[in-house]
Amino acid sequence: MIGRLAGTLSAALAGILLVGCGAETDSGNISVAPGEAKQGTATTSIEVEAHPLSSASDDPGTLAFESELMRLINDYRVARGLNALIDSPALRAAARAHSRHMALHGFFSHTSPEGLSPGDRLALNDISWDSVGENIAAGYATPQAVFDAWMASPGHRENIESDAWTHAGAGYALDAAPSDDSPHTHYWTQNFLRR
C-alpha cells in the first residue's frame, strides 16, 4: 500500500497536475510544474474584505513577465488565424491579485479559501462579462515555461485557442519565502472573458 502510494505520488511529481473548474466559468485549468506538486493545502481563514483585489505594486519585473505571457499567447493566436486578445489592465490586476492571494495564503485553486470563484473575483473588481475562463499554474519560473506547459495541456490549450474570448489578462506573483504549506515560488493566473 505504501509502495503504491509512493509510486502515485512520484507520478504526480513528475507530471503536470490538471484539474478542471466548473461554476459560472466556461473553462478553467490548473497546472503545476513537475517536481512542485503540492502535498497539502493550507486554508487560512481571512475576511473577504481582505482579499487582495489589486496589486500592492506595479513592479517592472512583474509587469514584464505578464506582458511577455500575453505576447506569447497573442502571437500564437494570430499565427493560427484567431483574434489577438485585448490585454485588459483590469483583468491583469484581477489575475495578479489571485496569483498573489494564492502565494500569500498557501492555496492553489480557482476557488479562494473564502469561496470566491473566478467570476466572483471579477465581479468584486467591477469587471463585467458574459463568459469567463481561467488558467492557473504554479512553479514555472518564466513566461515561456508556463506558456509551454499550458500548450502541452489540452484544457489550458483550449482556453488559449478559444474564439469565444475577446479580452484577457495575465497575472504573476513570486513567493520569495516558500514553505512546506506553500512550496511553490511562482504563481500564474490568466483570466479570459467575453463581453
Per-segment meaning from a language model:
Residues A33-E36, G40, R92-A141, I160-S162:
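Short, surface-exposed glycine/acidic/tryptophan-bearing loops
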Residues G61-G119, T166-A168, A173, A177:
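Short, well-ordered surface patches within globular domains
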Residues N29-L63:
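Post-signal peptide N-terminal segment of mature Sec-exported envelope proteins
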Residues A23:
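Short, conserved catalytic or interaction motifs in soluble domains
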Residues L17-G20:
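C-terminal motif of bacterial Sec signal peptides marking the signal peptidase cleavage site
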Residues A84, N135, N191:
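Conserved beta-strand positions that form and line the central face of beta-propeller blades
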Residues M1-S10:
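Bacterial N-terminal signal peptides that target proteins for export
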Residues D26-A37, A42, A138, T142-R195:
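Disulfide-stabilized extracellular recognition modules
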